[in-house]
Each structure stands twice: as C-alpha cells, then as structure tokens.
Amino acid sequence: MARYTGPMTKKSRRLGVDLVGGDSAYERRPYPPGQHGRGRIKESEYLLQLREKQKARFTYGVLEKQFHNYYTEASRRAGKTGDNLLQLLECRLDNVVYRAGFARTRRHARQLVTHGHFKVNGKKVDIPSFQVTAHDVIDVREKSLEMTPFIVARETHGERVVPAWLEAIPSRMRVLVHQLPVRAQIDIPVQEQLIVEYYSKK
C-alpha cells in the first residue's frame, strides 16, 4: 500500500510535533524549517484545521484517501466522531505493534507487519491497516522470534511504556488487547475536533 516515505523530521518541524517518536533531530530544532526557524505567520482557521489533520495523518503514516476513509467510518459510528477517528487509527495493527514496544517507530512496525512476522488470533496478518479488536491476541510468528528486531525488542522492552488498553508479554512476544482505547488513553497531541471541522466543511 502506498505511504509517505519522505523525511519525517522536516514534517515534524513544520507541524510542530514529533511524528516519529524520539526524533533527536526534531528535539534539537523544534521550530519550522527555513532560515533561522523564523516564527509562524498568524494562521487562519482553515490552516489550523489542516495542520491538525496533517499531524494525525503523518503520525499514523496514512495517505489522504485512506485517512478520509477513516473519517467517513468514524462519522458513521455512535459517539464523538473525533474520538472514533483516533480509536480507528490507534487500532491499526502496525500502531498496536509499535505501542506494545515491539518496533522502534510506527514506520518500523509497518515494515515488520508487511513482511509477515505477526499472527492475530493464530492467523498470519500482513496488512498494517488491519483493525484489531478487544480480546485479540497478537503474536510474533515462531520462525521470526530470533530475528534481530525482536531480540532487541525483548532485551530493551523495559524502557517502553505500554498503554493500559494493551498488555505486552515480551518473553513470548505477545500482545493482548484488553479493550479498545478511549480518548484519554491516546497520547498524541492532536485536537481532533479541528479535524472534524475540516472535513465537515468539505
């Protein structure tokens, strides 16, 4: 599936948020790219809405058409559209692998999923956008357990913070999905209501 593969630090600086997670280059220069990191001009309501959409889209690594599809699905569900949207994004398999501490970044997690290293409820899944649900069990496939990324993940897992809606068992390279995440458990710095306003005007 198509995805953005360009420089993420520049995107992070432009949007004012670390899109990678632990991006030291962004931490050194957390201001917009350009000469001397000049200050932002006053942004219109539309630009503020667009920026929030782009933050979410690039954080989860999805292209515009797919992101719009997530919004459409979120708007059909009961509850707040913004909360539903973030829940759909959080429940992508690649994001769950990242959140569980089994990959360095979401981009790395996407690669591991695409290469077929994971099973969901005992069945191989190689689609990064696969939606996990409550009570799903995600395992690294047995033949992949001794690959370097997973050895490193086991050895360094104590450094990662796993959200409460998931349980990671690094000794078995297993993730248990206890529940679907609620907004308070999703720690990305995005104002989802601005995303809803952006699409509601389309």
Swiss-Prot record:
Residues 91-157 form the S4 RNA-binding domain. One of the primary rRNA binding proteins, it binds directly to 16S rRNA where it nucleates assembly of the body of the 30S subunit. PROSITE patterns: RIBOSOMAL_S4, S4. The keyword Iron does not apply. One of its GO terms (biological process) is translation. NCBIfam families: PRK05327.1 (NF003717), rpsD_bact (TIGR01017). Keywords: Ribonucleoprotein, Ribosomal protein, RNA-binding, rRNA-binding. This is Small ribosomal subunit protein uS4. SMART domains: Ribosomal_S4, S4. It comes from the Bacteria. Disulfide bonds: none annotated. Signal peptide: none annotated. One of its GO terms (cellular component) is small ribosomal subunit. One of its GO terms (molecular function) is rRNA binding. Belongs to the universal ribosomal protein uS4 family. Part of the 30S ribosomal subunit. Contacts protein S5. The interaction surface between S4 and S5 is involved in control of translational fidelity. Coiled coil: none annotated.
